[in-house]
């Protein structure tokens, strides 16, 4: 009886949001899911287009007023806290608007929490990193958007409300200290930390100025992909061009060891092998 709440917070990243919606729709998990899009741009609200408006799994919330202070938001932690108020699932995935979620991401995450039901969180040991110079690689990092967590525990431990960022460490530190985050070596990357976008689509990367005392406003000033029309999904061919890069990376990485970790043929066959059919 799992319901997976994919929760996206966003500000002036219109093209990224369209791509991310499409990646949600292309998840191959057969089960209950929802995508909450929490937009804090009060000048350019997000509206689902005709193709998306009939999909009951997708919900857009346009709001720039902190539910606790009744003032405009001044940090991402408060935004994430308010965004999960709209989630109705049992489990939470931070669906970062500018990153890449491969078709098996949710399915593998659910497989993980089923294997380790006493855990509050699960993640694959390795994800991937798409650098700004176009280099795509297997990468190990905390990468909170690669984690699936019990939503009740996320609500209980919350987010750091600080302008510099690092908001996930409020819950993440507790999970790690209590050994309730399972980092699974028997896994395959399903998420990519993406710095490859260029031009207006790239905008500002908050992780690039992490802990700057005014990181929140730097991000707002540097992100200008305005919503000037309704949201529509990416085409199948556009998505497939992205997916094929990862298929090549993962296929070429089978049985190669990275600090004791390796992608097995079994996991490739289980999760990746049908990648060419996910966008039909």
Regions found by a protein language model. Name each.
Residues 162-165, 169-280:
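C-terminal catalytic/acceptor-binding lobe
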Residues 106-135:
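Conserved donor NDP-sugar-binding/catalytic core segment of glycosyltransferases
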Residues 22-32:
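Short, acidic, metal-binding catalytic loop of nucleotide-sugar glycosyltransferases
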Residues 66-87:
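Glycine-rich, basic loop-to-helix element that forms the pyrophosphate-binding segment
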Residues 32-43, 61-66:
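Short beta-strand/loop segment that forms part of the nucleotide-sugar
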């Amino acid at each position: 009886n799992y319901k997976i709440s994919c929760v996206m917070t966003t500000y002036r990243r219109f093209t990224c949001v369209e791509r991310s919606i499409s990646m949600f729709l292309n998840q191959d998990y057969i089960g209950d899911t929802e995508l909450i899009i929490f937009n804090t741009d009060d000048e350019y609200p997000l509206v689902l287009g005709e193709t998306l408006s009939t999909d009951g799994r997708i919900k857009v919330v346009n709001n720039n007023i902190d539910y606790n202070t009744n003032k405009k938001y001044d940090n991402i932690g408060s935004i994430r806290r308010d965004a999960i108020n709209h989630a109705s699932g049992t489990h939470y995935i931070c669906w970062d608007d500018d990153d890449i979620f491969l078709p098996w991401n949710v399915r593998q995450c659910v497989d993980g929490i089923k294997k380790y039901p006493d855990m509050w969180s699960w993640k694959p040991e390795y994800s991937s990193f798409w650098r700004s110079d176009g280099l795509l690689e297997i990468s190990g990092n905390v990468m909170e958007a690669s984690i699936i967590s019990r939503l009740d525990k996320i609500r209980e431990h919350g987010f750091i409300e600080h302008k510099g960022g690092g908001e996930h460490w409020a819950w993440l530190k507790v999970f790690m200290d209590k050994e309730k985050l399972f980092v699974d070596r028997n896994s395959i990357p399903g998420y990519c930390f993406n710095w490859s976008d260029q031009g207006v689509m790239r905008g500002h990367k908050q992780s690039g100025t992490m802990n700057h005392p005014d990181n929140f406003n730097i991000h707002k000033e540097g992100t200008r992909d305005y919503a000037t029309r309704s949201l529509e999904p990416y085409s199948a061919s556009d998505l497939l061009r992205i997916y094929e890069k990862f298929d090549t990376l993962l296929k070429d990485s089978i049985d190669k060891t990275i600090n004791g970790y390796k992608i097995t043929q079994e996991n490739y066959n289980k999760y990746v092998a049908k990648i060419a059919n996910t966008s039909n």
